[in-house]
Amino acid sequence: METIIRRFSPKEKEKEKEKEEKDEKSKDKKEPIKTRSKSKNDEEEEEDEQELVQGKPKGNSKNIKTKK
């Protein structure tokens, strides 16, 4: 088998190095996880879930008025 020896000019070497660096950087970059912004309704649902987990009654106890 013949081995092919490829010789680069200095400019080509620089271009090859730049390509390799770009490839490495692109591999390192992770795509950010796309999430939708939370609406007020979503936040309320999360609070309700947390209250259920903690054993608190569902609902807003701050606004409940009791008659004496």
UniProtKB/Swiss-Prot annotation:
Compositional bias per record (Acidic residues), positions renumbered to this chain: 42-51
Domain of life: Eukaryota
Organism: Dictyostelium discoideum
Annotated protein name in UniProt: Putative uncharacterized protein DDB_G0267218
Biased composition (Basic and acidic residues): 9-34
Species lineage: Eukaryota, Amoebozoa, Evosea, Eumycetozoa, Dictyostelia
Region (Disordered): 1-68
